[in-house]
């Protein structure tokens, strides 16, 4: 716990907006220490988090009471359905993480048989956000968590209704990343039922090149923000809020139509 507090202080001293992720079981125990360290945003995260916690071994977290008494904004997740998201929003959460098992390193969908396709989950949670806005006048941010490796994936998440995205594997491809091209992300570690694995992502460039470019490859894994801006411009939108209103469709052939040569040669969209 002291090490967590020390790292928060180091990032704050560097002028970085700092967040910390805790599980529901450890939230109350860690709360005072991390808030005293100057934390800007608290993330309460599990595979699936509900507004009502049940525990036979410890005092369950009263999420609504905790959020209302906490001094900084709280983001909660994951969730993947309209009703679960609406319940989380009604606790006072500033943002909701969307995604159960879409990440590259996560095996929850195979181990537990639980998950919702990410585009559907984002759209459903965005619908809950609009209902909550109509009921309360409070806008809750929808954050797509996992399943995005390319700029086009981020663009599609925004058009489905996300306000922001949380990515893992693209950042592990940075030269600066400590694992040097490997990713073991936020997937659940468990001594008897692990639900995550280590995957190779390869080193592709600097963190700046991955996020802001310039790209020296044409597969969409570099210059993610440049791809998002170009996607918005191509569709005729200037802001993310406008882009959320773009028309979307289910198009399985989008990645393969007219790309036979790329696939046969293993280049571009064919690898």
Tell what function each PLM region has.
Residues 3, 71, 113-144, 149-271:
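Alpha/beta catalytic cores of nucleotide-metabolism and tRNA/nucleoside-modifying enzymes
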Residues 1-136, 141, 171, 259:
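Active-site entrance/lid segments in N-terminal catalytic domains of soluble metabolic enzymes
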